[in-house]
Design a protein with these regions (language model features):
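Core dinuclear metal-dependent hydrolase active-site scaffold
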Residues: 1-64, 139-196, 280-284
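Active-site metal-binding motif and surrounding structural segment of the metallo-beta-lactamase
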Residues: 46, 52-105, 206-208
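Active-site neighborhood of phospho(di)ester-bond hydrolases with catalytic His/Asp-centered motifs
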Residues: 48-52, 69-80, 105-107, 182-187, ...
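Short, well-ordered amphipathic alpha-helices
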Residues: 56-60, 85-92, 114-122, 227-237
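Alpha-helix termini
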Residues: 63-64, 90-99, 121-131, 200-203, ...
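Residue-level recognition of the N-termini of beta-strands and the immediately preceding loop/turn
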Residues: 69-70, 100-103, 133-138, 205-206, ...
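Metallo-beta-lactamase
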Residues: 98-101, 107-168, 273-278, 282
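Cap/insert and terminal regions of metallo-dependent hydrolase folds
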Residues: 188-283
Length: 284
């Protein structure tokens, strides 16, 4: 399994466009891994996690084509994770040739909100209609939390995120070819039910990717902080949910308390995890 980080920032990217805080200034000076687009990830070349606003820029900048994407797991409908205008580029009216069918997976709440937005702002028809399926070469799949389902060659289980009440936000455990990854953003501390299900299902992850919106100087609120990431990683190790060679990565990184990449990476190293950056490719 190959995991490509298309973006690793929180909602407003990093540095933030109009911000002159120390962290944003330093990120602009250093460039490189300190410059972050909004979070999304690609597994192998066919499974996208989040149809985010920056995926096209990431694809072009990283030389990572998306034309073989067959599946999309949508975490939730917030604008930094879901840009429905990308779906219009699947329409014949845009001259698109050869796009494979896209199987799109999301919770009922996410799909209902997306359908309303799509019809109101973009196309004049519902994303859940047969018209959308025909024009966009799209198949919609409604998923439930704590249920397993098959996505092409992948076995997936969705978990309820501790985030955005009423929007059906999801986290995902994904397994293929003997490799297992947990993609855990956006979320505040994981629910007890999630931990219980990890144990009941005897899950054991090779890679864990966690929300790291707030840095070492900030408390976690609606998202995880650096110290909460450390706590989650340590708990996973103590409960045997990760192997001895498993890796834990931070993503969804905001300027609030998170320094530019070199300093944040050094902090993470001292505490047993790593910091993802845009364009990072993991071989699992």
């Amino acid at each position: 399994m190959t995991i490509t980080f298309l973006g690793t920032a929180a909602a407003n990217a990093f540095p933030e466009a109009f911000c002159k805080c120390r962290n944003c200034i330093q990120a602009r000076i250093l460039g490189g891994p300190s410059l972050r687009k909004r979070s999304a990830a690609l597994i192998n070349n066919d499974l996208l996690i989040d149809l985010g606003p920056d995926i096209m820029a990431a694809s072009q900048m990283q030389g990572c084509p998306l034309d073989d994407v067959r599946y999309c797991l949508q975490t939730h409908p917030h604008a930094d994770h879901l840009d429905l205008s990308h779906l219009l580029s699947r329409s014949p009216s845009y001259g698109v040739v050869g796009a494979p069918i896209l199987d799109f997976y999301a919770s009922r709440e996410t799909l209902e909100l997306a359908a309303e937005t799509f019809e109101r702002d973009l196309a004049g028809y519902s994303l859940l209609s047969s018209e959308a399926e025909k024009h966009l070469n799209l198949k919609i799949h409604q998923i439930q939390p704590l249920e397993s389902f098959t996505v092409g060659p992948y076995s997936v289980m969705a978990f309820p995120a501790n985030h955005a009440p009423g929007m059906g936000a999801m986290l995902y455990a994904i397994e293929a070819a003997g490799c297992s990854v947990f993609y855990g953003t956006d979320t505040a501390p994981l629910f007890d039910q999630t931990w219980q299900t990890f144990r009941q299902q005897k899950m054991r992850f090779d890679v864990v990717i966690l929300d790291h919106t707030y840095g070492p100087e900030q408390p976690g609120t609606d998202h995880l902080s650096a110290h909460q990431v450390i706590e989650h990683a340590n708990r996973m190790r103590s409960e045997g949910l990760v192997g001895s060679h498993a890796r834990v990565f931070a993503t969804h990184i905001a300027h609030e308390g998170n320094p530019a990449h070199p300093d944040l990476a050094e902090f993470a190293k001292q505490h047993g995890y790593q910091v993802a950056y845009d364009g990072l490719v993991l071989k699992v």
